[in-house]
Regions:
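Sequence-level preference for short, compositionally simple segments enriched
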Residues: 1-190
Length: 190
């Protein structure tokens, strides 16, 4: 049912999202991440998977679909892990490199984030650009990507990051220069 008042509470879910609102919402609820994990099928034995994500409880899932429409990309999925309100958690995730390059990065460059998340975005965008050029497929480039990725969403002291299984155990393939990549990743060098 549509209200006579176009800005009334009844029409809040029907209106298209405003860019400024999206920036504020992502500042509070969004995440830019660059996980790097072992994958023997990749040339260097490591896979880099940058992702922009927003997570909400089941009662707010409509906003994720609105963001998906707004950006023109991404996948909304359910995770049956419950939050403290016993709801399923839903997430909008954008992983396709082309979608990140064409939709997500240009938007946040035009409408900058206002919190500390702006720094995470800058590092995230740098990684995506390096990947677009194929740097993550070279030993030195993978080390550079890993170094930049280690600065994103850093809430743990570096010694905890160093103890991660993905960092401790090299892939089960012989890659020339692999030790250099792992060493630069462990120590945050580029």
């Amino acid at each position: 049912m549509t209200s006579e008042n176009p800005s009334g509470a009844g029409n809040q879910q029907e209106r298209p999202l405003a860019a400024e609102w999206v920036v504020g919402f992502v500042d509070g609820e969004g995440c830019f991440s660059v996980p790097i994990f072992r994958n023997a099928t990749c040339r260097l034995g490591w896979q880099v998977q940058p992702e922009f994500a927003v997570v909400q409880g089941e009662r707010s899932v409509k906003v994720l679909y609105a963001l998906q429409t707004f950006f023109g990309c991404g996948l909304v999925t359910v995770n049956h892990r419950h939050d403290n309100h016993r709801q399923d958690m839903w997430r909008l995730g954008v992983r396709r490199l082309d979608d990140l390059v064409r939709h997500i990065i240009p938007f946040f460059e035009q409408y900058p984030l206002l919190t500390a998340k702006a720094g995470d975005f800058a590092s995230f965008a740098k990684v995506v650009r390096l990947m677009e050029e194929g740097f993550h497929l070279q030993v030195e480039g993978l080390g550079q990507v890993a170094s930049i990725a280690s600065t994103i969403n850093r809430r743990k002291p570096s010694q905890l990051l160093e103890s991660s299984e993905a960092i401790r155990q090299p892939p089960d393939i012989d890659v020339p220069g692999e030790d250099m990549v792992l060493a630069s990743w462990r120590h945050g060098e580029s």
